[in-house]
Amino acid sequence: MTDRIVPATLVFREDGTVVSPLYGDIYHSAAGALAQADHVFIRGNGLPERWRHERAFTIIETGFGTGCNFLATWAAWRADPSHCERLHFVSVEKHPFAREDLRRAAAHIVAYTTITTITPIAPLVDELANAWPALTPGVHRLEFDDGRVTLTLVFGDALDVLPNLALRAHAFYLDGFAPSKNADLWSPAIFKSLAKLADERATFATYTSSGAVKRALDEAGFAYRKVDGFAGKRAMLVGEFAPRWRVRRHEPPRAFSTDRRDAIVIGAGLAGCAVVERLAARGWHVTLIERRERIASEASGNPAGVFHPMIARDDNLAARLSRAGFLHALHRWRALERAGHAFSRSTHGLVQLATSDDEFERMRESIDALGVPAELASALSRDDARALLRTDVAHGGWLFAQGGSISPAALAAAQCAAAGDRLSRIVGVEIARLERGGDGRWRALDASGATIAQASVVVVANAADAARIAGLRHAPTQRVRGQLTLLPPGSAPAVPLPVIGDGYVVPLANGVTLTGATYEPDDTDATPREAGHRENLERLERLLPAFSANALDAGALAGRVGFRCVASDRLPLVGELGDEAAAAREAAALTGARLRDVPRATGLYGAFGYGSRGLVWAALGAELIAAQIDGEPWPLERELAEAIDPARFLVRALRHGRVA
């Protein structure tokens, strides 16, 4: 992976404090981690009083450690009857603990706390540990208390990851090992990165009062003052962001400004229904418009789809996005299930088989070189694959222990059910275009020009039609036909898990097997064809040699056709859309523009171009859009968000003088 994560080693000193053998320093004061968190960071930032005046409040912490600062803050938020509506806690950690080590460390600290004036913390430890993510580089978003508390963990070196975050912080917890033990975390570069994320009223607190830290704070635009430290420590620093000069070219993201929290989502497939659920969870009232008579009727209406991350030796953008999307989707799906919105999915893993011995060796080497955790993926020899799948295979491959298959339509229905009475549906109506009125509200119009719905925000999530409806000239997408084949009981090897490789095979209910799929660009025929079934049978024979393609009459098989929407660079288009008309007017000044310089179509967002990866990308894409609309911390690195920014094609056109 980009930089493999080296977990922290759990060691206790005789006095019960947790110590890092790597840095030779303690994680917390011997006088108590939770008491230290309360004195230094919570009260040092004027909490809980300050968050009472915000709808949402964002904290950044440098150094998650044992998690006690987060646990203490979460408990304080719970105990405050006037707390903010949503609390966002973002924490960077280079060496996170493994799940059970984190549980042991936090539970030990909580057991010996002397704080009795806040919400009991012991139950929160288990919630945190149970949700703890795989130790992979990048951003991991966890949700607690029905999504009102989010913990965004960023695993990696703070010097690298802080400049790659997109958020607006109200408070900073400057933690970490002592400056003498970990100088990088207190370097001027760190404070300059934090200054670019600070709200105008942001505060900070830290236990240290070293001269080097004070100089770095001052240079970055933070005003500081000394106050009494914790447990007899003479002094600590608190202060606020108060730059004496302009310190940043781009302001950190703000919430979309509107008095009416209503939105239109066009397209009721995986992309659209995921957006519906995420906006409704934040209190938005959503109108979902679908041209078919029911939701998930097009590509999302397939009997099953497979979900798994992508692994590449160079850990490229697509691989990082698929890993982030896969892990985020699992977290969201489990939350839906816990809330009583169950849907059909397999939970016993998925196997990806190599197409040659050389490819298997590359797959095995990639796992080792990238340091992929076994809970994410592991190498599977040919013999092991045979034993696991109970049938012959030509080569080994990967086991994705948390991968599997899912009913896309059932997932979409669960997401709509979770939205409850905040969702209104309009089906059987096709939107022809969008227009923004003088009042700033968007109107969705049909072919006759009649207004079907209006709202402050619109999200186009209707695949290949999205760019047309939004009036985008610089969003190159292609419609790709995919034909599936259904095999009757007993006609194919009865594999217990979904298998992918050159094609895929998914066991369905009642012994039926799903296999596919063809890949036919610009073919608009929606009728299953015998040639497509034959192609799928031949692909299945290569995947599972025990199957004979000639044993079945391709012309007698049932199947289904769906259409993928694929962008020219094979990445999705997710986020706020560019204002192409404004860009054309300013084209001369935008020839060297970056994405953050491009004018945007205020209140208009896209979620399309997911190709064959809708199950993996839709949940993360929806969370990104909801975060952008509400001005929350983004759930992935800015580099990845920019890779899928719908305006990326507009920027390329501007650079080549093709916008007029």
UniProtKB/Swiss-Prot annotation:
Its cellular-component GO annotations read: cytoplasm
Give the catalysed reaction(s), semicolon-separated. 5-aminomethyl-2-thiouridine(34) in tRNA + S-adenosyl-L-methionine = 5-methylaminomethyl-2-thiouridine(34) in tRNA + S-adenosyl-L-homocysteine + H(+)
**Annotated segments matching region tRNA (mnm(5)s(2)U34)-methyltransferase:** 1-242
Q: Does the keyword Acetylation apply?
A: no
Name a GO molecular-function annotation. Answer: oxidoreductase activity, acting on the CH-NH group of donors
Q: Which domain of life is it from?
A: Bacteria
What does the record give as EC number? 2.1.1.61, 1.5.-.-
Pfam entry (one): Methyltransf_30
In residue numbers, the region (FAD-dependent cmnm(5)s(2)U34 oxidoreductase) covers: 266-660
Q: Where in the cell is it found?
A: Cytoplasm
Keywords of this entry: Cytoplasm, FAD, Flavoprotein, Methyltransferase, Multifunctional enzyme, Oxidoreductase, S-adenosyl-L-methionine, Transferase, tRNA processing
Cofactors required: FAD
Give the record's GO biological process terms.
methylation; tRNA wobble base modification
Known HAMAP family for this protein? MnmC
Summarizing the function annotation, the protein's role is: Catalyzes the last two steps in the biosynthesis of 5-methylaminomethyl-2-thiouridine (mnm(5)s(2)U) at the wobble position (U34) in tRNA. Catalyzes the FAD-dependent demodification of cmnm(5)s(2)U34 to nm(5)s(2)U34, followed by the transfer of a methyl group from S-adenosyl-L-methionine to nm(5)s(2)U34, to form mnm(5)s(2)U34.
Enumerate the NCBIfam families for this protein. MnmC_Cterm (TIGR03197), PRK01747.1-2 (NF002481), PRK01747.1-4 (NF002483), tRNA_MNMC2 (NF033855)
Q: Which family does it belong to?
A: In the N-terminal section; belongs to the methyltransferase superfamily. tRNA (mnm(5)s(2)U34)-methyltransferase family. In the C-terminal section; belongs to the DAO family.
Identification of the protein by name: tRNA 5-methylaminomethyl-2-thiouridine biosynthesis bifunctional protein MnmC
Lineage of the native species? Bacteria, Pseudomonadati, Pseudomonadota, Betaproteobacteria, Burkholderiales
Name of the encoding gene:
mnmC
